[in-house]
């Protein structure tokens, strides 16, 4: 079992490292919600897709408890879920509701996945050089990313 937290869920290297070290299940305790600077932008589908992608790419079961409620300007949207290595959502909480999720996890499905998708054995570490370069600040002082504002999203 691996226990990375919150922000780690956005980085594929974290899930890959746990998968390579033999974890069958990751649990990402999370506090994610609305974006006060972009109130019309819903991050929930992106958040869930990224994590489900980690499950698929690394043959992992992933449980993601997310908080609910309001704190300051942020509305935490809940939507906790459990995914399997094939990208299926095994259990999912409604948005903005606190619930206990339960799902049956058959670890043999991970072994099936490892045989079907030999991603670990066919990796290309010789192409990963940039992954170990020092981190630099990619955020511009105007609050936009390197490529400017998010298309279709206004900061107002």
Task: Give the predicted meaning of each segment.
Residues 61-156:
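C-terminal beta-strand edge segments of enzyme domains
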Residues 6-101:
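CN hydrolase (nitrilase-like) catalytic-core segments centered on the catalytic cysteine
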């Amino acid at each position: 079992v691996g226990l990375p937290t919150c922000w780690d869920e956005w980085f594929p290297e974290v899930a890959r490292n746990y998968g390579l070290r033999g974890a069958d299940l990751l649990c990402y305790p999370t506090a994610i919600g609305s974006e006060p600077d972009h109130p019309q932008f819903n991050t929930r589908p992106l958040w869930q897709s990224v994590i489900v992608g980690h499950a698929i790419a690394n043959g992992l079961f992933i449980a993601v408890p997310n908080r609910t409620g309001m704190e300051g300007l942020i509305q935490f949207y809940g939507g906790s879920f459990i995914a399997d290595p094939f990208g299926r959502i095994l259990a999912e909480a409604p948005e903005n509701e606190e619930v206990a999720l339960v799902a049956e996890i058959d670890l043999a499905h991970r072994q099936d996945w490892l045989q079907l998708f030999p991603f670990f054995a066919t990796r290309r570490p010789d192409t990963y050089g940039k992954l170990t370069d020092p981190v630099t600040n990619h955020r511009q002082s105007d609050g936009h990313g390197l490529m400017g504002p998010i298309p279709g999203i206004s900061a107002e």
